[in-house]
Amino acid sequence: IVAVLTILVLFATGAVGSSIARAKDLVDTAVIALAPAAGWPQQTGITDPDAVAQMSGSFVEMGGDSCVVYSLGGTRLNSIQSGYARPAIAAGKTRFVLYNRSGNELRVESRTQNLYTKTMDSTISLCAVADAGQVAVVTDSTDSVAKLTVYNSSMQQQLVWNLTSEQGTPLRMAFAPDSRRLAVAAVSAVGGQLTTNLYVLPLSQGDPVCLGSENSVPQWMGWMSNGFLLVLYENRAVLYNTSGGSAGERASYDFGGGTLVSVSNT
């Protein structure tokens, strides 16, 4: 059925001008929609989950070096044994990245199959995936404190940002819902004080815009539907305007001396 659906998608989308990976994403969507729901509960095979991320009509679960993908109806779609020493995942709408934080390899996976496997020049520390399929990768660098590379949905290099020690090392990243901008929270040490610098990187220009700095570590950040960016630091929550001449902090809420330990995004 997958082969038949692939052929139909190729004709329906005029795939001569579109990527095979995008066609596979569309086939995945059709397969998930047409497959009978197995229902819940299910034994995923992962007894101690390290991370779970939602995608369109599905989710990916990681435990140790194992990953499984299930539809929201309970159908098993994919299973991966990476062998990575320190695996991590980052998910977008229809694909996710499985990467090794103790190595230089990453895998771009659709909901049912591998799309790309890439070996970087140095150790990977962080990845993010856009809903439109772009992938941001942070690696070690001999020329700067960190190197951030953004790839398009076909894993072709789109832009590179070599961060200085003053700019910091990216700790968290989040693509905007329209996949045209990337928010980057980078930490640096200034005078013995840990500082978080928050940037927005327009993918069409590649020139980062600094939204502000905070003497606290970001625990979570995400884009709001109106283009604002919400960042949850250890000591307060801050809402940022990300565009125009008024880019910067818009509103904040102090935790009153409390410290935020973790965030659950459900």
Regions flagged by a language model, labelled:
Residues A15-S19, S66-V68, N104-V108, D143-T149, ...:
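Structural motif
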Residues G45-A53, S82-T94, S122-G133, Q167-F175, ...:
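Repeated scaffold domains used in trafficking and secretory/extracellular systems
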Residues I1-T47:
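Sequence/structural signature of beta-propeller modules
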Residues M62, Y99, V137-T139, A185, ...:
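Residue-level marker for isolated small/hydroxyl-bearing positions within beta-strands
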